[in-house]
Structures are given as C-alpha cells and as structure tokens.
Design a protein with these regions (language model features):
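Residues in the recognition helix of alpha-helical DNA-binding motifs
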Residues: 52, 56
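Positively charged, aromatic-accented nucleic-acid-binding surfaces
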Residues: 1-48, 74-134
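N-terminal entry module detector
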Residues: 31, 44-45, 57-62, 66
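Short Lys/Arg-enriched helix C-cap and helix-to-coil transition segments
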Residues: 61-77
Length: 134
C-alpha cells in the first residue's frame, strides 16, 4: 500500500487489550495502527511515543512500505479534520522494543509466542469414488 491509500477500521486489523490483559486482533485486513492507537495500546504519553517513533524512523534504514501503511481519515464532530498515518506491523513490533512498559513487554511476548506456534494448516482430502459407501 502507498501512503495515499485511505483506509477505515473495516479495511485493516489492529490490536486491543482484552479483559485479562490478552491481546485481541480486531479487523480482517493487514495490521496497521495510528499514533493514537499506539498511545492507548502501549499506555504511553504522546511525548514518549513521538520521541521513540521519530527516533525509529530517522535512525533505521526502512523501506517505504515499512514506514507507512496508508492513512485513515480523522473526523471531529462529523467534519473531516485531516488524515492520520497508519503504521504497519513492522513499526509496531520495532516500537515495542523502544518502549519499556508492561504492555510493550506483553506484546513482545505475544509476538514471540505467535512466531513459535504458527497456526496449523488444515489439509483438505478429497476421496473420489464411483459408487455408494454401502
């Protein structure tokens, strides 16, 4: 996706916290989050988030698709006020290593568990026959 692509929450997935501090993936598209979703998800201040995010984007040589996953429209009182950048999963993971809170630690743990235990593939087996089962 390019930076001029506009998305809604229906077009993407994002992370939220469940009741017992479990991570819930919401949505059905590619994972991408806005800065305000980072602040809520990682429970950090805007100042800390902006500092760490700018440091990450300036310091590390990232490809353009690793930097942004599009934009989402921002509405205030029903009026379009602007656009917020969406950051892809690569930035979310890298940012979690720049933050030191419990939420970032649990997110890193979740990502490592997902990588170690991939979702099992379901194999379909078709049996061709020319008669009844009896």
């Amino acid at each position: 996706m390019n930076a001029n692509h506009y998305q809604t929450k229906r077009d993407r997935s994002y992370f939220e916290w469940g009741d017992k501090m479990q991570i819930i993936r919401k949505g059905k598209g590619e994972i991408a989050m806005t800065e305000s979703e980072f602040v809520d998800f990682f429970s950090v201040t805007w100042r800390k988030l902006n500092y760490r995010l700018q440091l990450l984007l300036k310091t590390y040589p990232l490809q353009s698709e690793e930097r942004a996953a599009g934009e989402v429209e921002v509405f205030v009182n029903g009026h379009l006020r602007g656009y917020a950048l969406l950051y892809p999963l690569t930035i979310i993971i890298a940012l979690s290593y720049q933050l030191d809170g419990m939420e970032a630690h649990l997110f890193r743990k979740h990502i490592c568990q997902e990588l170690q235990h991939p979702t099992p593939m379901v194999e379909q087996i078709f049996i061709y026959g020319s008669g009844s089962i009896n």
